[in-house]
Amino acid sequence: MKKYSALTLIMALALCASQFVQAQASKDAKEAAKYSKEGFEATENKDWDKAVDAFRKAAQLDRKQAPNLVAALQHRGMEYTTQKQFPEAIADFSEALKLKSDDANIYERRAYVEMKISDYDKALTDYSEAIKLKPNDVRYYLYRSYIYETKGDVKNSMADTEKALKLDPNNQEAKSRKTRLEARQSANAPLPPPPPKSSPRASPAAAGRP
């Protein structure tokens, strides 16, 4: 009889705990929805500081809100890039990558900023990550080829250039680089490479409203 009573008590406590967790989850979801609404309103006004703050609070309460935070961080990061606030831009893209590490576009955006401050080693790493995620994107090979050439690594620069031409045989930038690299190999003379013409995509995919 005592064993039966103890078992009943344990089951009752477990039920109460489950109900409490469900109630708390429901409360958190409602609170997250409120912050999310504030974030969308800030987004419409292009107030990225407020949007990031609101979506961050929402994501802390409900992980389903994380994509909205990722989008807001990218928008603010690109705004920082435009304003030449490069450390702040890198910080936002880095936070976005912690939440979505499989997004090649974010690696590209961070690498673009790293190139702006001549941090070529980090940019090289980020473009390599982008290539792993999107191995058929010609632009990534062109950028990485440019970095290799800037660092004096003609062999790897040529390898990426040839990969770009394999993906896009008519790519004029790749053709010009290959000609220049071949001349450099022949003359064994360091020639300063012109920067690539392409740039990161204009904006991240906007998160849909719930």
Predicted regions and their residues:
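Helix-start (N-cap) detector for alpha-helical repeat units in TPR-like alpha-solenoids
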Residues: 32, 66-70, 104-105, 138-139, ...
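Canonical tetratricopeptide repeat
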Residues: 71-75, 109, 143, 177
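Conserved structural position within tetratricopeptide repeats
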Residues: 57-60, 64, 95-98, 129-132, ...
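Position-specific recognition of the canonical hydrophobic site in helix A of tetratricopeptide repeat
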Residues: 36, 43, 74, 81, ...
